[in-house]
């Protein structure tokens, strides 16, 4: 492809993983500020776990051998170590890491729920993480987990179903031509 972004998908996703790792591996206890700052940092660490989980999931779907009959997953760097020439993990290990990251994301973000700002489009909300995790579990055919996560989102009452007559107009930007 002549599209450099499409051609460099592997590299671009691993850049996200590297940046997420910097946050995930940050020692929150080294912060000098009050407990509120540590709680906010915990929330952002949760967001980083979510980004890493989604990145690993995208890499597994694009470059893992799950759907071609192989057993190779992807490379799972969870700490920065430029000298480590890490090989591919198995599909099972890759999926275990994705699930652990989604779980850590939800746990950390829910423990600092006061920092959840679903109206801020530059941040990942708790419900957005649950939706991403539900999508992952849908790929794994784990419908009980999907239902549990989706029920949590619905129970939050932050969203409503759009009436069928308003569906098309709901995609139109207000004030656009």
Language-model regions: role of each:
Residues 1-63, 89, 107-110:
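Conserved, well-structured interaction surfaces
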Residues 17-20, 24, 95, 102, ...:
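Inward-facing hydrophobic residues that define packing positions of alpha-helical scaffold repeats
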Residues 36-39, 62-92, 96:
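Short coil/linker segments at helix-helix boundaries
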Residues 43, 50, 93, 117-120, ...:
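Residue signature of alpha-solenoid helical repeat architecture, marking inter-repeat boundaries
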Residues 55, 134-136:
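Residue-level signature for tetratricopeptide repeat
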Residues 60-67, 113, 139-142:
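Short coil/turn linking the two alpha-helices of tandem helical-hairpin repeats
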Residues 106-107, 114, 154-156:
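Amphipathic alpha-helical segments of tetratricopeptide repeats
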Residues 141, 145-177:
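Hydrophobic-face positions in mid-chain alpha helices that act as interaction patches
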């Amino acid at each position: 492809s002549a599209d450099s972004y499409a051609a460099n998908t592997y590299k671009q996703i691993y850049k996200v993983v590297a940046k997420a790792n910097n946050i995930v591996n940050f020692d929150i206890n080294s912060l000098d500020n009050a407990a509120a700052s540590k709680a906010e940092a915990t929330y952002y660490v949760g967001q980083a776990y979510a980004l890493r989980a989604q990145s690993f999931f995208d890499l597994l779907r694009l470059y893992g051998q799950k759907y071609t009959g192989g057993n190779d997953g992807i490379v799972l760097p969870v700490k920065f170590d430029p000298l480590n020439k890490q090989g591919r993990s198995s599909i099972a290990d890759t999926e275990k890491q994705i699930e652990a990251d989604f779980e850590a994301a939800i746990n950390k973000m829910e423990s600092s729920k006061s920092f959840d700002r679903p109206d801020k489009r530059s941040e990942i909300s708790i419900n957005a993480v649950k939706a991403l995790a539900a999508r992952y579990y849908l790929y794994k055919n784990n419908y009980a987990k999907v239902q549990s996560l989706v029920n949590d989102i619905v129970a939050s009452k932050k969203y409503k179903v759009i009436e069928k007559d308003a569906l098309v107009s709901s995609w139109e930007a207000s004030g656009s031509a």
